[in-house]
């Protein structure tokens, strides 16, 4: 679907008339769940997940058949400041690895039965160093938001977004600090594996960016423009598109959460269609999830990004939906109810 906006004002307008969850589907799914051949509540959070999914899909007996994983790749000017354990050229190299099927995300998509798309966002033109100037112009931000919006398959019934971009945990830390408050040190973690003096330098870069753009940080989209990256903006655009289309979303790690947090700061209901697939080993992720009101499904010590933790959670949601829609009721099975 072509993005219905050509400016940041147009993107903001998207959130003025967001569709609501289908209350009739929620009621039907809840009623059906009460009649299934199990003690009430015996499937725990799986029951909540299935009813949540039913409401957004709009079907009291839903199916999960077309999950999409949308990966976005972008390069960051701040990567030249040595904030990552890997050089900037790794972004392009990893995109090639995705297309060749050799990355972890490819294997996990196969196991989860998910399609995978990769969108490259001007990899030959990194964003600017946000300690010197805004990372993006307004036009560049709008283009990245639109690229994310248009990458979503209208036929998908679940969306996971992931990212590749050397330096993007630095951008995510800056976004989180700007949106949530606190110091650069509270939000800056090891990312790709930096430690010691390298982590200290990364933290200084985040602090410098926050100071440089202090006058712009009361506006969530200005936070994204000044401190973010194209792939982070594209994830925000994709999540927004899913919200408008009532497509459920599973959020991934810290970088994905920073993108989602921008939307949450615009209006908290922007993330009603989203759940957190996991909590990552990036130190600030639990705090970021708490700030947007999301309880993670998994805690596996993962910190790869790229959508991987959320993809692992797809089969948890698939299991929940299968039980709601496939189990027999007490009446159908001829089993006496409790």
Swiss-Prot record:
It is an enzyme of class 2 (transferase). It comes from the Bacteria. The active site is at 306 (proton acceptor). Its EC number is 2.4.2.21. Pathway: Nucleoside biosynthesis; alpha-ribazole biosynthesis; alpha-ribazole from 5,6-dimethylbenzimidazole: step 1/2. InterPro entries: Nict_dMeBzImd_PRibTrfase, Nict_dMeBzImd_PRibTrfase_bact, Nict_dMeBzImd_PRibTrfase_N, Nict_dMeBzImd_PRibTrfase_sf. Keywords: Cobalamin biosynthesis, Glycosyltransferase, Transferase. It catalyses: 5,6-dimethylbenzimidazole + nicotinate beta-D-ribonucleotide = alpha-ribazole 5'-phosphate + nicotinate + H(+). The keyword Transmembrane helix does not apply. One of its GO terms (biological process) is cobalamin biosynthetic process. Disulfide bonds: none annotated. One of its GO terms (molecular function) is nicotinate-nucleotide-dimethylbenzimidazole phosphoribosyltransferase activity. Catalyzes the synthesis of alpha-ribazole-5'-phosphate from nicotinate mononucleotide (NAMN) and 5,6-dimethylbenzimidazole (DMB). Belongs to the CobT family. PANTHER family: NICOTINATE-NUCLEOTIDE--DIMETHYLBENZIMIDAZOLE PHOSPHORIBOSYLTRANSFERASE. This is Nicotinate-nucleotide--dimethylbenzimidazole phosphoribosyltransferase.
């Amino acid at each position: 679907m072509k993005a219905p906006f050509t400016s940041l004002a147009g993107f903001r307008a998207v959130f003025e008339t967001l569709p609501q969850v289908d209350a009739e589907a929620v009621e039907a799914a809840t009623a059906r769940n009460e009649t299934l051949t199990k003690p009430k509540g015996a499937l725990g959070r799986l029951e909540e997940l299935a009813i949540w999914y039913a409401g957004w899909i709009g079907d009291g007996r839903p199916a999960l058949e077309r999950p999409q994983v949308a990966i976005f790749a972008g390069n960051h000017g701040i990567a030249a400041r040595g904030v990552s354990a890997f050089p900037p050229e790794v972004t392009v190299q990893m995109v090639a690895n995705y297309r060749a099927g050799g990355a972890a995300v490819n294997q996990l998509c196969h196991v989860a039965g998910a399609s995978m798309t990769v969108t490259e966002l001007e990899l030959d033109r990194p964003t600017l160093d946000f300690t010197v100037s805004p990372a993006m112009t307004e036009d560049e931000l709008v283009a990245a938001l639109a690229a994310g919006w248009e990458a979503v398959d209208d036929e998908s019934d679940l969306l996971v977004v992931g990212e590749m971009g050397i330096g993007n945990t630095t951008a995510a830390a800056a976004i989180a600090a700007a949106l949530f408050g606190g110091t650069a040190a509270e939000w800056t973690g090891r990312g790709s594996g930096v430690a010691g003096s390298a982590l200290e330098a990364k933290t200084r870069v985040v602090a410098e960016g926050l100071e440089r753009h202090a006058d712009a940080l009361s506006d969530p989209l200005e936070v994204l423009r000044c401190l973010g990256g194209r792939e982070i903006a594209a994830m925000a655009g994709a999540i927004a598109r899913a919200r408008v289309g009532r497509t459920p979303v599973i959020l991934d790690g810290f970088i994905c959460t920073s993108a989602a947090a921008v939307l949450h700061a615009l209006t908290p209901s922007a993330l009603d269609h989203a759940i957190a697939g996991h909590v990552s080993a990036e130190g600030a992720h639990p705090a970021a999830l708490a700030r947007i009101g999301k309880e993670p499904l998994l805690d596996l010590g993962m910190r790869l990004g790229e959508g991987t933790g959320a993809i692992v959670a797809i089969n948890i949601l698939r299991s929940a939906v299968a039980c709601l829609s496939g189990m027999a009721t007490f009446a159908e099975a001829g089993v006496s109810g409790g």
